[in-house]
Swiss-Prot record:
Keywords for this protein: ATP-binding, Glutamine amidotransferase, Ligase, Magnesium, Metal-binding, Nucleotide-binding, Pyrimidine biosynthesis
Species: Paracidovorax citrulli (strain AAC00-1) (Acidovorax citrulli)
Residues binding ATP: S14, L15, G16, K17, G18, I19, D71
Family, per entry: Belongs to the CTP synthase family.
The protein, known as: CTP synthase
Binding residues annotated for L-glutamine, in chain numbering: G357, L385, G386, M387, Q388, E408, R474
InterPro entries tied to this protein: Class_I_gatase-like, CTP_synthase, CTP_synthase_N, GATASE, GATase1_CTP_Synthase, P-loop_NTPase
Annotated catalytic residues: C384 (nucleophile), H521, E523
Biological function: Catalyzes the ATP-dependent amination of UTP to CTP with either L-glutamine or ammonia as the source of nitrogen. Regulates intracellular CTP levels through interactions with the four ribonucleotide triphosphates.
Known partners and oligomeric status: Homotetramer.
Residue numbers binding UTP: S13, K191, T192, K193, P194, T195, Q196, K227
Length: 559
């Protein structure tokens, strides 16, 4: 029978529920349990696909084409289980499903209400995410409830999991509450009152937490833990201190050493082998003992919020660990780069990465960046839009296609080398069609798809014969211009197997040591254990470029 751990948050948002949930999952997985995670988001958007990165951060894409919360990226990086569409749902998705049932007459004329109809629907979605009733059922499902206790948006979710816990009976569910202890410098102490109040609010709803994860900028003294225990009715050994650390990969060890996994296993009556966190310890060792450092310019337009590129940042760090170097990432606003000052802005970097994005703002700066990297032989990795701007730049300045552009940015361009995809096969095999008037939400080419890779190319060195990666885009390289680009020297090194859409472009090795653009999003498949072959190769190229720029010492004069 699948057991459930429900993770809630209080006081303030952005405390790290996703990392805490993923860390607990990683510890339980190390005990030999099959674990999954489910994220419940209380906003009314059907999914985060149309939300601004400044509002929501990165949109993480699963193999089966779901546009999901960025926490699912943490989940996949921490445990072996791959996330699916069923691992993330929102208030909007729930209400959409309830209303569709009402229109079909499934409720037999009853008045549709939050209780029981919405709360029952939430419970059904949670069970679906845990694989209950299928061959994919897990031992433990950790359910993270977004938002903070006290928010009106979260109430249906909290009521649903309270009912679910009651229906499952004792020892089949546990509640973990993440809270915040502010440090008041003037008083020189951590304050427990906000934690007392948030637990009181949770108990008013009918939920008694089994463990408290207490976030602070320092360790919580035993005296304060005892005080929290007394006023929250949580056993003192269930009051867990979570202090700030320099890498998120230290969190599993932190939680294990304070007995969180033991507490959960006792509560759920799980008889498991001992925890083994050796590979996590090795990971931390790699991060703390680099043999060098490279600096990467990430040129984009969402640079004011690092969560906008969360998976790219993590993939670069993973590749750094595989290459035994620390990767320093500097975000460069593409709107600040113009043709005359690209060298001034970019010359100091060991490699350049242009990530995905949407809209015309900052695009010309990205095109200038691609040109600088091409002409100065700086390692360049373009992801999604980063591949498209590299193609536009090459068309303009090498292939002689003046004013070439994407129809996303200039509908009247004389040379639309990038254009809207009108038909393709989706991740589940269905044929999708789109036009300029299609809705924005859920209408992109999404999910994992395979492509053939040309032999003798850089892409083939990295991937082999076949590449399978996740996609999230509406625009593609225009097939009508591929021959002209090839004749001008651009290498089209991977094409989709059915539609022959461009997946990878690169420059010949005799022209540039390492220049590649990919239409997909490789960052979504990077893990701290193996990195990702494309990012690993990119960081290796950055190391080589750094070495090539170092002055060589003159040979010692003969004596």
């Amino acid at each position: 029978m699948t057991k459930f751990v429900f993770v809630t948050g209080g006081v303030v948002s952005s405390l790290g529920k996703g990392i805490a949930s993923a860390s607990l999952a990683a510890i339980l997985e190390s005990r030999g349990l099959k674990v999954t995670l489910i994220k419940l988001d209380p906003y009314i958007n059907v999914d985060p696909g149309t939300m601004s990165p400044f509002q929501h951060g990165e949109v993480f894409v699963t193999d089966d084409g779901a546009e999901t919360d960025l926490d699912l990226g943490h989940y996949e990086r921490f445990i072996e289980t791959r996330m699916k569409k069923t691992n993330n749902f929102t208030t909007g998705r729930i209400y959409q499903s309830v209303l569709e049932k009402e229109r079909r007459g499934d409720y037999l004329g009853k008045t549709v209400q939050v209780i029981p109809h919405v709360t029952n629907e939430i419970q059904e979605y949670v069970k679906r995410g845990a694989g209950i009733g299928t061959g994919d059922a897990v031992d433990v499902a950790i359910v993270e409830i977004g938002g903070t206790v006290g928010d009106i948006e979260s109430l249906p979710f909290l009521e649903a999991v309270r009912q679910m816990s009651l229906r499952m009976g004792p020892n089949n569910s546990a509640f973990v509450h993440l809270t915040y202890l502010p440090y008041i410098a003037a008083a020189g102490e951590l304050k427990t009152k906000p934690t007392q109040h948030t637990v009181q609010k949770l108990r008013e709803i009918g939920i008694q937490p089994d463990a408290l994860l207490c976030r602070a900028d320092r360790r919580i003294p035993d005296e304060e833990r005892g005080k929290i225990s007394l006023f929250t009715n949580v056993a003192e050994w269930g009051v867990i201190s979570m202090w700030d650390v320099d890498t998120i990969y230290k969190v599993p060890r932190m939680l294990h050493e304070q007995g969180l996994d033991g507490l959960i296993c006792d509560k759920l009556r799980l008889n498991t082998p001992p925890t083994s966190l050796k590979r996590w310890d090795q990971l931390v060792y790699e991060t703390e003992h680099p043999q060098g450092e490279v600096t990467i310019a990430m040129v984009g337009k969402y640079v004011d919020l690092s969560d906008s590129y969360k998976s790219v940042n993590e993939a670069l760090r993973h590749a750094g660990m595989k290459n035994h170097v620390r990767v320093k990432i500097e975000h460069v606003d593409s709107e600040t780069i113009a043709p005359g000052d690209a060298a001034e802005k970019l010359a100091k970097y060991d490699a350049i990465l242009v990530p995905g994005g949407f809209g015309a703002r900052g695009v010309e700066g990205k095109i200038c960046t691609a040109r600088y990297a091409r002409e100065q032989r700086v390692p360049y990795l373009g992801i999604c839009l980063g591949m498209q701007v590299a193609t536009i730049e090459y068309a303009r300045h090498v292939a002689g296609l003046a004013n070439a552009n994407s129809t996303e940015f200039d509908a009247a361009t004389p040379h639309p080398v990038i254009a809207l995809i009108t038909e393709w096969k989706d991740a589940d095999g269905t044929i999708q069609t789109r036009s300029e008037t299609s809705d924005l939400g859920g209408t992109m080419r999404l999910g994992a798809q395979s492509s053939d890779v040309a032999s003798g190319t850089l892409a083939h060195e990295i991937y082999g014969n076949i590449v399978t990666e996740r996609h999230r885009h509406r625009y593609e390289a225009n097939v009508n211009y591929l021959d002209r680009l090839r004749k001008a020297g651009l290498v089209i090194s991977a094409l989709t197997q059915r539609e022959q859409l461009t997946e990878i472009v690169e420059l010949p090795r005799e022209v540039h040591p390492w220049f590649i653009g990919v239409q997909f999003h490789p960052e979504f498949k990077s893990t701290p254990w193996d990195g990702h072959p494309l990012f690993n190769a990119f960081i290796k190229a950055a190391i080589d470029h750094q070495k090539s720029r170092q002055p060589t010492l003159p040979a010692a004069a003969a004596s």
